[in-house]
Regions:
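Short, basic-rich loop-to-helix N-cap that marks the start of a DNA-contacting helix
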Residues: 79
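A short, well-structured juxtamembrane/interface segment
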Residues: 91-100
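Extracellular beta-strand-rich solenoid/capping regions of secreted or surface-exposed proteins
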Residues: 129-130
Length: 435
């Protein structure tokens, strides 16, 4: 299944065409860009422990490891965006054939957030004398929660660049019928106006220092939702644009201690204030996606000190996530009638299956004996047929119970740095229990 979806998402000929269409200074001689993407995808999926190991296992690699690393550290960010957005477009027809639900029928949802890459090892000569952490950059990601796919990505090499500026290229591709949601960092006039100018709608949380308001209407009560009460008003900003502001008064404070939240939106009146307040809660789904990227896939390769190489590693992990997401949907649809309502497959357990079975498949069934599907309909039907062979229990998601809130207290540095022997603590606890 993984091989089928990978070929659909990043067919070698298509990847090389993307390289030719979007490259600026790079060129292909003996090492094709499709080969680089294939190697990085194997590492991101965990099918190879490292790029070095993946390169040594690849038959027919005609360049040295030094040439491979040199190619990777020169990968242009424009190529990464074209790769992610293009591969998502290739997967969307298959996802739609498999079937999916809609959070807000009639609208395409886009959740935007930034992901800063962690500090890398200081292997580069220029970094060795630096005491502080070396940050290789970040990416602003557009995520579709209905499809569970990352549909666009804007990589940025400068870790200190503004996310508010970096999101503008993503908004340039927005269109009517789309609803973009973002946190309070993006509540600025340039961002909101850029979104509205494309015909798209937005829901953005209001920060403490928001754009200046020229006029505010009276508040109108709008009823209640599960988490609290809602009211709204019309606001006008300095550019003369009039938007809706929705206030949500929470029954209990959230994790940040907030009891009141405000949202700005330009959605039409057909979407109620209660819906706007409820829709914003969906924004947290992108946090879950980032968490799965970090825990299931190799999205943070700290040995890649070069910003371009680190961003390629993250983009490869995003690509791998989209592949696993299609596999997850295939398994859920294949077993939907036999499993209880709300049953979900786990991306983590699917990744474990992929890692354990992929190598054996490569040996038992070489590529020349593995026919690939040419249409999304054919691919969806074949994925469902293969998914029915998977035991649902082996890939079922294990939901965790709610965490018990613990009060945060001030702690002395000496106590924070203290340590104990786990074996001795357990032994003492057992003795106390028996006493």
């Amino acid at each position: 299944m993984t091989k089928l979806v990978l070929e659909q998402a990043v067919d070698a000929k298509w990847v090389d065409k993307v390289f030719d269409d979007h490259r600026q200074r790079q060129y292909s001689r003996e090492l094709l860009f499709s080969t680089v993407v294939e190697l990085m995808s194997l590492v991101s999926l965990g099918l190879r422990p490292s790029l070095h190991a993946a390169a040594r296992k690849m038959e027919g690699l005609s360049v040295s490891l030094a040439a491979l690393y040199d190619k990777i550290k020169r990968t242009e960010p424009e190529l990464l965006r074209a790769l992610i957005s293009g591969s998502a477009e290739r997967l969307i027809p298959t996802v739609e054939t498999l079937g999916h639900s809609s959070i807000l029928p009639g609208w395409q949802l886009r959740i935007v957030d930034g992901n800063h890459l962690p500090a890398t090892e200081k292997r580069l000569g220029a970094l060795r004398n630096e005491r502080g952490a070396a940050r290789p950059g970040f990416s602003v990601v557009a995520y579709d929660p209905d499809l569970d796919l990352v549909v666009d990505l804007q990589p940025w090499e400068d870790a200190y660049a503004s996310e508010r500026v970096s999101v503008l290229p993503l908004l340039a591709r927005a269109c009517a019928g789309q609803l973009w949601m973002a946190d309070r960092l993006y509540c600025t006039l340039p961002v909101l106006q850029a979104c509205e100018d494309t015909g798209a709608s937005f829901i953005v949380r209001q920060p403490s220092k928001h754009p200046r308001l020229v006029q505010e209407s009276e508040w109108q009560d709008s009823g209640a939702v599960d988490s609290g009460t809602v009211r709204e008003q019309i606001i006008e900003v300095t550019s003369g644009r009039r938007w809706r502001r929705v206030e949500l008064s929470l029954q209990t404070a959230n994790d940040s201690g907030d009891v009141v939240m405000w949202f700005w939106s330009n959605l039409p009146d057909t979407i109620s204030a209660q819906q706007i307040a409820d829709l914003y809660r969906r924004r947290w789904s992108i946090e879950g996606m980032f968490q799965r990227l970090e825990s299931v896939l190799e999205s943070e390769i700290t040995s890649f000190g070069s910003p371009k190489a680190a961003l390629l590693g993250f983009a490869s992990a995003v690509l791998a996530y989209n592949v696993l997401s299609v596999l997850k949907r295939s398994v859920e649809q294949a077993h939907r009638e036999t499993q209880p309502e709300g049953w979900e497959a786990s991306i983590f357990h699917l990744a474990v299956h992929v890692r354990s079975d992929y190598q054996g498949l490569q040996i038992a069934l070489p590529a020349e004996n593995f026919p690939l599907e040419k249409t999304s309909q054919g691919l969806a039907e074949r994925l469902l047929a293969l998914a029915r062979l998977i035991k649902p229990k082996s890939v079922a998601k294990s939901p965790r119970g709610a965490k018990v809130a613990k009060p945060k207290e001030w702690l002395e540095g000496k106590a924070a740095r203290a340590h104990v022997s786990t074996a001795r603590v357990l032994k003492a606890a057992k003795a106390d229990k028996q006493a």
